Amino acid sequence: MRLSSMWLCSLLLILKLQLSSTYPISTGLTDTDMDILKVLLSRLEESVSEQMAVDQSAPGQRDLLDSLSTEDAGDGPQPDAGLDEAEIREFLSAKNLKSVRNDSSRRSSGCFGRRMDRIGSMSSLGCNTVGRYNPKQR
């Protein structure tokens, strides 16, 4: 009985796989939706080909625009010219980055992160620890 039921289940499974592969899963798009997408795709291809033709026919104009933009940029004031390179290095130094990372507002948040000295001590781990033992206060 067990062998026949297993054989029947495997036959049904194979049949199910064959039937499901013959009918593709519907994408939810109708024929009109597909037609609209095809029209949009063809319009996109046309506009891209037109733009490529314009770009290839006018390389001299692009060079002219690039030269004008570099000349305009040179005439204006430089925004970062007043900063000294040493000041920039000092601002980005590891000491300053460490002080940002060890900000006192983070250390005194009151929620986790305080140090536990030994097992059983009141270490103020957790939230709402106002008024509890703090070894720094003594």
UniProtKB/Swiss-Prot annotation:
* Residues making up the signal peptide according to the UniProt record: 1-22
* Principal cellular location given in the protein's record: secreted
Name its GO BP terms in alphabetical order.
Answer: blood vessel diameter maintenance; cGMP biosynthetic process; cGMP-mediated signaling; negative regulation of systemic arterial blood pressure; neuropeptide signaling pathway; receptor guanylyl cyclase signaling pathway
TM ranges: none
InterPro entries according to UniProt: Natr_peptide, Natr_peptide_CS, Natriuretic_peptide, Natriuretic_peptide_brain
UniProt keyword Disulfide bond present: yes
The record, for PROSITE patterns, names: NATRIURETIC_PEPTIDE (PS00263)
Q: Which GO terms describe its molecular function?
A: hormone activity; hormone receptor binding
- Could you identify this protein by its name? Brain natriuretic peptide
Q: Where in the cell is it found?
A: Secreted
Role of this protein: Cardiac hormone which may function as a paracrine antifibrotic factor in the heart. Also plays a key role in cardiovascular homeostasis through natriuresis, diuresis, vasorelaxation, and inhibition of renin and aldosterone secretion.
Swiss-Prot/TrEMBL keywords: Disulfide bond, Hormone, Secreted, Signal, Vasoactive
Q: From the UniProt entry, list the residue stretches annotated as the region Disordered.
A: 50-84, 99-138
* Family assignment from sequence similarity: Belongs to the natriuretic peptide family.
Gene Ontology CC terms, in alphabetical order: cytoplasm; extracellular space
Disulfide connectivity?
Answer: 111-127
